[in-house]
From Swiss-Prot:
It is an enzyme of class 3 (hydrolase). GO terms for cellular component: plasma membrane. This is Lipoprotein signal peptidase. The chain crosses the membrane at residues 55-75, 85-105, 124-144. The gene is lspA. Its EC number is 3.4.23.36. It comes from Bacillus cereus (strain B4264).
Length: 152
């Protein structure tokens, strides 16, 4: 299915970008892309966003495996007839696997996208995180649109 190709594409872009950061930037260094808005910053994370559950790798391993099995099952069952759901789940699967690969092989996640939103210093993130968030937002939008159609 094309949705697995989307997941593989996310994994590839995520892992290549992280490899480039690890090979070419010292930990903690930043490259400004748009001053006061967007930076490429070499950062490592041993937990989730905002340092939640730091150094609890076993927890992330278990949760990710269960989550990936659920996503694959859900894709097989429901994505055949629903393109947007399939695309969303492909993005989520790719994002989950991208960070899982880091946790297994590096015991930490490589983050590098650093943004300031209205002067708020948002936690540094990566391509996998972005794919996960975009996938979730697409599912929320789809759910809201379907709810609106059902009311009409």
């Amino acid at each position: 299915m094309i949705y697995y190709v989307i997941a593989l594409f996310v994994i590839a872009i995520d892992q290549i970008s992280k490899w480039l950061i690890v090979k070419n930037m010292e930990l903690g260094t930043s490259i400004p892309i748009i001053d006061n808005v967007l930076y490429i910053t070499s950062h490592r994370n041993r937990g989730a966003a905002w340092g939640i559950l730091e150094n609890k790798m076993w927890f992330f391993y278990i949760i990710t495996v269960v989550f990936v099995v659920f996503i694959v099952f859900y894709m097989k069952k429901y994505a055949k007839t629903d393109k947007l759901l399939g695309i969303s789940l492909g993005l989520i699967l790719g994002g989950a696997m991208g960070n899982f690969i880091d946790r297994v092989f590096r015991q930490e996640v490589v983050d590098f996208i650093h943004v300031y939103i209205f002067s708020y210093n948002y936690p540094v993130f990566n391509i996998a995180d972005s794919a996960l968030c975009i996938g979730v937002v697409l599912i929320i939008i789809q759910t809201l649109l379907e709810g609106k159609k059902a009311k009409e």
